[in-house]
């Protein structure tokens, strides 16, 4: 079995043009303060209020790559962290979007996190505390998040009861 590492072009995740965003309060300064210490962010708001646009705007403003994942009930932990794939040369590891973000120092935006299953969201826990690590159990690797990595999650207020699963 051969295992090859992925080479990632960080520029593909950077937002080239400024996304339109109209500030409605202190959210820009609050986000920047949280980013300065790489504090994970949780953004709550109704559908269509601009949560995703806000995160895109902040990634652009900070000049950081952004990897967005639209969460859903069929998403597995492997969809987030990665999996082994077979090809003509054997087996290779393919990083998932969360792993890629942690490796390259991107902002990882998990949109509608409460749509994901509890057994999927549990993988984010060590990235949200002082450890800032991501265990890749299938690969036997523990990734220390890049110093620029930040996790941002969002949800709609109607799904608040589901937050019990990610607390």
Locate the predicted segments by residue:
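AAA+ P-loop NTPase catalytic core and its hallmark functional loops
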Residues: 1-167
């Amino acid at each position: 079995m051969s295992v090859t590492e992925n080479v990632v072009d960080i520029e593909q995740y950077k937002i080239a043009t400024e996304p339109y965003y109209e500030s409605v309060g202190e959210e820009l300064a609050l986000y920047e303060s949280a980013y300065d210490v790489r504090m994970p962010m949780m953004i709550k708001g109704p559908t269509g209020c601009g949560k995703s646009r806000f995160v895109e705007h902040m990634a652009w403003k900070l000049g950081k790559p952004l990897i967005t994942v639209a969460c859903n009930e069929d998403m597995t932990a492997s969809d987030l962290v990665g999996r082994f794939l077979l090809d003509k040369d054997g087996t290779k590891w393919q990083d998932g979007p969360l792993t890629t973000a942690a490796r390259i120092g991107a902002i990882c935006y998990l949109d509608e996190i409460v749509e994901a299953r509890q057994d999927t969201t549990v993988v984010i826990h060590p990235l949200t505390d002082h450890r800032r690590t991501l265990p890749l159990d299938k690969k036997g690797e523990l990734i220390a998040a890049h110093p620029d990595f930040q996790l941002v999650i969002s949800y709609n207020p109607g799904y608040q009861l589901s937050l019990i699963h990610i607390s």
